[in-house]
Curated annotation (Swiss-Prot):
Catalyzes the reduction of arsenate [As(V)] to arsenite [As(III)]. Does not constitute the major arsenate reductase in cells: essential only in the absence of ArsC (AC P74313). The gene is arsI2. One of its GO terms (biological process) is response to arsenic-containing substance. Gene3D superfamilies: Glutaredoxin. This is Arsenate reductase ArsI2. Disulfide bonds: none annotated.
Amino acid sequence: MIVIYHNPDCGTSRNVLQLIEAAGYLPQVIEYVKEGWTKPQLLGLFAAADLTPRSALRTTKSPAAELNLLEETVTDAQILDAMVEYPILVNRPIVCTPKGVRLCRPSEVVLDLLDHWPSGPFAKEDGELIIDERGNRVYT
């Protein structure tokens, strides 16, 4: 089973979801901004993805700066509390598969988590090619 913690307003998140679906998977899609987070859920995801609250913090287009979360003196516990209160603070998308858990930025990171890929070609919304016409990953 594949789970994607998704924000439909995010181009990277949309690209990752489309890539997963184009590969033939039917992921469980969790719109985390609507559903929110729990501390245990975030701690589990961060541990599995080798992230910390600070490294998973969305610093742009979020209230991180106005909440003073970008200061070096802010602890991971404080960031985690803020993430539970303001789900948009968590960077996205986070994808879970039997191969692991990753913050999939850039979009092509998700390929490392899939057993099979779209047959190709596959391009991001902006036209950047991720998989060529032969089904091979494009490295830029």
